């Protein structure tokens, strides 16, 4: 049984019903419908913390989804799961793949910056200032891109850029 049919709360049930109605009335191919179903089930599993199930659904959705814009959100969500699991290298890979398909994902740039900043902080603790500087430079670039896409958002990143004298 698809996950969308087993969700217990009212909002999830309502969202599933609306999504099913939209899938019936909007002209889409069966592959697009199937990809969306896997994506929706992945989001549901992810929101419940069932990351393994979410990844299975997202991987299947990426196999079926042909639209680059839609694929970008699937890849972004895979990146979120890898970030949550502490798999930062994999997360960066998926965020980058998402941005390749949709360069207007400020949240992906922000998450990439957070990971780079974290790695820079780790390098500082390990006494490697050269590596720390490289990671911090990369974090700054990603935060600048996120801020450029959504001015007024990412206030903490904006403040860090000013304090670190990395904002032009």
From Swiss-Prot:
Write out the annotated subcellular location: Plastid, Chloroplast thylakoid membrane
Q: Which UniProt keywords are given for this protein, alphabetically ordered?
A: Chloroplast, Membrane, Photosynthesis, Plastid, Repeat, Thylakoid, TPR repeat
Q: Where are the TPR repeats?
A: 35-68, 72-105, 120-153
Source domain of life is Eukaryota
Topology versus the membrane, per the UniProt entry? Peripheral membrane protein
Checking SMART domains in the record gives: TPR
Q: Which GO terms describe its biological process?
A: photosynthesis
| One Pfam family it belongs to | TPR_1
Q: Which PROSITE patterns match?
A: TPR, TPR_REGION
Q: Which GO terms describe its cellular component?
A: chloroplast thylakoid membrane
> To which protein family does this belong?
Belongs to the Ycf3 family.
Q: Which HAMAP family match?
A: Ycf3 (MF_00439)
What does the protein in this record do? Answer: Essential for the assembly of the photosystem I (PSI) complex. May act as a chaperone-like factor to guide the assembly of the PSI subunits.
Q: Which NCBIfam families match?
A: PRK02603.1
Protein name listed in UniProt: Photosystem I assembly protein Ycf3
Could you read off the lineage of the organism from its UniProt record? Eukaryota, Viridiplantae, Streptophyta, Embryophyta, Tracheophyta
What is the primary gene name for this protein?
A: ycf3
